[in-house]
Amino acid sequence: MKGTVTVKNLTNKVVKEVHVGLLQFDNKGYPVDVEYSWEGEDNLLNCRMQSANIEPNRSYGSGTYWDLEDQVKKIKACVKSVKFLDGATWENEYFDYWLKAEKSSY
């Protein structure tokens, strides 16, 4: 399966890089663990959109994807952090809450 995520820049800055947490599930909604520990843990895959260069009010991700395990049929995604072109960063303070609430089932 190919996992794709589209993000929209709702700021007035150019987004250089986006870090997305991607939860993987099978066709019955059960978690599918990542194959390699350096990619993530449990069913959380750590994904980066590098050199995205998303201008304000623009979207990015259409036509880009990550190759996922064959048994993955459904995904959930959440932005974990953003790096702006000016060097500033944004961390999603709610990411860990989202992960805890969403990782067990689809």
Regions found by a protein language model. Name each.
Residues 1-4, 19:
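Short, solvent-exposed loop/turn segments enriched in Ser/Thr/Gly
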Residues 6, 21-23, 78:
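Soluble periplasmic/extracytoplasmic beta-strand elements of cell-envelope proteins
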Residues 7-12, 24-26:
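Asparagine-centered strand-capping/turn motif at beta-strand->loop junctions
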Residues 19-30:
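Extended low-complexity, serine/threonine- and proline-enriched intrinsically disordered segments
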Residues 31, 35-89, 100-106:
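Short, solvent-exposed, Trp/other aromatic-anchored flexible loops in extracytoplasmic proteins
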Residues 91-93:
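Extracytoplasmic/secreted cell-surface and envelope-processing proteins
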